[in-house]
Every structure is written in structure tokens, then in C-alpha cells.
Amino acid sequence: MDCLKDDRFKGMKHFWSSVVVDRPKNRKKLDENIQAYQQEAEFSIDEKIANLSDLTGIFPLDLVINDVLHQRFCDRAIPPLGDEDKRFSYPANSGDGYIAWCIPREIIKKKTRNKKDFWIVRVTDETCVDSKIKCWGVDSIKDNLYLNRPYIVKVNFSDQWGFSTKRGTTHWKLMG
């Protein structure tokens, strides 16, 4: 869309609001829209990710993970969570579980029947496979995950429950 924007617009969000959100029917209305939406800031990185994902159906991995970070994952043999062939080839050092990397896209907060908090985190990775990880034992005050940021996560897997982690977000490490 950058090729459509000219010097009358401050940024892409200004252009989008003037042309798409409030569609002008004539040139006079376009000029009014340009003045009305003059204060629009640029799209944030999260807005760009959401727009590209919604429009194309593919997560824009290049906006989240740079080549250096991706190479670090490869050098350490940390597979993406959606890669079934490599996922269980790299066990975690202590206890049960496996290490993989992923990008949280959505956090659904729920309660068990005993009124304990848990999260269902929808994640994606370079394989474009959406997975859900259940995070048990979440402290809603202390635990926090950032959406659209790469994490290394220690996960357990069972056929009945799928992916899960214990003790809130202690098994999640922010990488970017």
C-alpha cells in the first residue's frame, strides 16, 4: 500500500483512515478526510501483525523473529512447536517435558471447576501450525505473557490433553 500513499498523508494509518475507513465519494470529501484524520499515528507493530495475519492467513514471522534469533534456535537444535518430526527429539534437561519455540497469539483465561486459574494459549511458529498450550497453576497477578513475541517453552504432551505447562509461566522464556 505504500505505493498508493503520497505526501499528503503522514503515515499508513492516516492513509487507511482517510481512504478505507471513511470512504470518500469525491475529491472534496477525500480532502476533508485527510484533514479530519491528520492526528492518526502510524500502525503499531501489533496492528501490522494482526492486519497481515487477517488479510493473508499467514503469520508474518519476519516481523517477529529476525535471522539472528532464528539461527540461534537452529544452532541449539530447538525446534518449532508445530514440527512433529523434531518436536520430541530435544528433551528438557530436568524432569519430563520437551523444549520448543513458539509465538503466543491469544491467551484465553479460564477457571477449573475448583476455581483455580489456567490459561489456554494459542501459539504459532514458522510451520504455520496453530497449537494450544494449557498453562496450569497460573497466578493472574504475577504471570504474564506477551503476544506476538517469540518464546522458548518447556512443554509436556499427552494424547488426552495435548500440550501443557505447569507452574504458570515459569517454563516460558521470552526471546525477543
State each model region's role.
Residues 1-90, 134, 161-176:
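Sliding clamp-binding short linear motifs
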Residues 106, 155-161:
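Short, charged beta-turn/beta-strand-edge "cap" motif at the junction between a beta-strand
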Residues 138-154:
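Short nucleic-acid-contacting surface segments enriched for D/E, G, S/T with interspersed K/R
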Residues 95-114:
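Structural detector for short beta-strands of small beta-barrel domains
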Residues 109-136:
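OB-fold (S1/OB) nucleic-acid-binding surfaces
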Residues 56, 102, 148, 155:
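A residue-level signal for conserved active-site and pocket-lining positions in enzyme catalytic cores
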Residues 98-100, 119, 151:
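Hydrophobic core residues within well-ordered beta-strands of beta-rich domains
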